[in-house]
Amino acid sequence: MASKIPNSALANLINGTIDLNTSDIRARLVMTNTTCDTEIDAINNLDDYTTIDVADATGYADVALSGETVTANDTDNRGDFDTTSDIVFTGLGGNATRNYQGVLLYKYVDGTNANDIPLAFVEFSSAIPKEATQVTVPSSTTNLLQATQG
């Protein structure tokens, strides 16, 4: 699984614009035409991506994360961000036009691409078939984000 964190998101984590303990963090399911897996420069808001390629299956909706945790991992010398519950996209119609490639995590501001702030793109280890009626991103298996000593 590969992740891409926009440079602006790194700055926003440091300056407090994105607070992983208190911000409303959401997940957006994206399909295989996304550019979220390659773009990290000059991505300040969601509308700065060339193509997000949001899931287009009937019944699709972004998911608000719940049970977010930020912990210091002294054993592995890093900080971890995760959720205590899986991220589950339910009620999908099984009729998307392309397979699912990953999730785009973002800070919800007002529900518009012009103002919502990207956090990270998390790629699945393999594409999920477009016929899926539910997509589950497991929690606490690899952590959603990790900050390590350089």
Model-derived features with residue positions:
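Small cysteine-rich, disulfide-bonded extracellular modules of the LU/uPAR three-finger superfamily
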Residues: 1-101, 108-150
